[in-house]
């Protein structure tokens, strides 16, 4: 990340392998900080501070403490020169996919702000909010993430929308997602080939006790169904629905039709179906079979 003045201060060529694009639009930077709703008790994890434009705004905010993680050693040197005199700031050199997510001074981090490199969006989301089969390492209250617009649209999509996908189901079962703003490619230096979007994610404070028990089955179910997202359910999972009375009852109770497509089924109904399947089916050779 970086603002106009900061961009000029750092003599650093963006590295493609790190997915580096400096955010230079001050209006977008302000919207990110506003969306984080920072107060004097908040401790923020900033992912990929880059050249420090957003870092500066976070330090100026009411937040109690900022812990940043940066992978590029050259940028780490510049960031330390610029911010190490700040008592409320600490910088850790490392890969966000493996580095500790706690603050170096021992405070508990409750919010995350990140400009996500496009090539690690999926793995980073799993680490920050968890996945169907595994709870997250840390519990965060709010995440404000800048990501590729196409991915953001999938996180935000509702059932029936053309962007609704297996990713939509996975994330919406774990958190509430809210659109913050669009970020055209011209807001970055260098400009990426695609536009971006800022999304606010609020992980649910409590998860259904059965959630992680059926997570593995639900993951396989989504993979199976959305592999043919244009196909009706009767052509993807219909064989075990029509042969299983309990599953047929579930479909009837929830008002689900086999003539619907996978993107028309709500996250809660996918979860409910997985719970019903756990009691009545097993997976053999990649297909669902009645017990």
Curated annotation (Swiss-Prot):
GO molecular function list: 16S rRNA (adenine(1518)-N(6)/adenine(1519)-N(6))-dimethyltransferase activity; RNA binding
Catalytic activity: adenosine(1518)/adenosine(1519) in 16S rRNA + 4 S-adenosyl-L-methionine = N(6)-dimethyladenosine(1518)/N(6)-dimethyladenosine(1519) in 16S rRNA + 4 S-adenosyl-L-homocysteine + 4 H(+)
One Gene Ontology term, aspect cellular component: cytosol
SMART domains, per the entry: rADc (SM00650)
Cystine pairs: none
Top EC class, one word: transferase
Cellular compartments annotated: Cytoplasm
UniProt keyword list: Cytoplasm, Methyltransferase, RNA-binding, rRNA processing, S-adenosyl-L-methionine, Transferase
Positions contributing to S-adenosyl-L-methionine binding: 21, 23, 48, 70, 95, 115
Pfam families in the record: RrnaAD
Enzyme Commission number: 2.1.1.182
CDD domains reported for this sequence: AdoMet_MTases
Similarity field: Belongs to the class I-like SAM-binding methyltransferase superfamily. rRNA adenine N(6)-methyltransferase family. RsmA subfamily.
Task performed by this protein: Specifically dimethylates two adjacent adenosines (A1518 and A1519) in the loop of a conserved hairpin near the 3'-end of 16S rRNA in the 30S particle. May play a critical role in biogenesis of 30S subunits.
Record-given protein name: Ribosomal RNA small subunit methyltransferase A
């Amino acid at each position: 990340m970086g603002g106009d003045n900061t961009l000029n201060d750092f003599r650093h060529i963006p590295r493609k392998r790190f997915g580096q694009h400096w955010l230079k639009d001050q209006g977008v930077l302000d919207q990110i900080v506003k969306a984080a709703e920072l107060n004097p008790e908040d401790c923020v994890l900033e992912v990929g501070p880059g050249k420090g434009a957003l870092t500066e705004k976070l330090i100026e905010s009411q937040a109690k403490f900022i812990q940043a993680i940066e992978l590029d050693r050259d940028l780490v040197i510049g960031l330390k020169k610029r911010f190490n005199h700040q008592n409320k700031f600490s910088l850790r050199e490392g890969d966000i996919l493996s580095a500790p997510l706690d603050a170096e001074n021992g405070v508990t981090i409750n919010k995350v702000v990140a400009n996500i490199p496009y090539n690690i969006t999926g793995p980073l989301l799993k680490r920050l909010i968890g996945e169907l089969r595994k709870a997250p390492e840390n519990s965060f209250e709010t995440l404000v993430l800048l990501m590729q617009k196409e991915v953001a649209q999938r996180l935000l999509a509702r059932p029936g929308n053309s962007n609704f996908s297996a990713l939509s189901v996975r994330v919406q079962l774990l958190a509430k997602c809210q659109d913050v703003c669009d970020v055209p490619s011209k807001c970055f230096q260098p400009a990426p080939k695609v536009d971006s979007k800022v999304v606010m994610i609020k992980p649910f404070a409590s998860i259904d006790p059965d959630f992680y028990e059926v997570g593995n089955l639900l993951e396989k179910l989504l993979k199976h169904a959305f592999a043919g997202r244009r196909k009706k359910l009767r052509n993807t999972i219909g064989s075990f629905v029509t042969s299983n009375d309990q599953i047929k009852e579930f479909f009837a109770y929830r008002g689900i039709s086999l003539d619907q497509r996978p993107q028309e089924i709500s996250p809660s109904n996918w979860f409910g179906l997985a719970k019903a399947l756990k009691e009545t089916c097993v997976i053999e050779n990649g297909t669902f079979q009645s017990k």
